Amino acid sequence: MARVCQVTGKAPMVGNKVSHANNRTKRRFLPNLQYRRFWVESENRFLRLRVSNAGLRLIDKNGIDAVLADLRARGEV
C-alpha cells in the first residue's frame, strides 16, 4: 500500500540530507501516517483509515461525517 494519507493526500517527498560538512545526499521525507478507527454514528460502524497527523486534526475540526462525505465525493472510500 502506498504511503499516502487518505484524508489529505500527503505523500512522501524527496529532499537532501545535509551533514555538518554540508555534504548532500538524497533522502525521503515520509508523512506521519497512522491507522486509526473512527466511529461513524450515521452508519453505526467503525471506519479504519490511514491518516496523517494533519488528517487527524482535519477530522477533529470538521468531523468524521464531513470528511467521509468529501472522501466519497472523490471516490476514495
Swiss-Prot record:
HAMAP family: Ribosomal_bL28
Listed name of the protein: Large ribosomal subunit protein bL28
A GO cellular component entry from the record: cytosolic large ribosomal subunit
Family of this protein: Belongs to the bacterial ribosomal protein bL28 family.
Record InterPro entries: Ribosomal_bL28, Ribosomal_bL28/bL31-like_sf, Ribosomal_bL28_bact-type, Ribosomal_bL28_sf
Record-level GO BP terms: translation
Gene3D superfamilies: Ribosomal protein L28/L24
NCBIfam families recorded: L28
GO molecular function: structural constituent of ribosome
This protein's UniProt keywords: Ribonucleoprotein, Ribosomal protein
A Pfam family: Ribosomal_L28
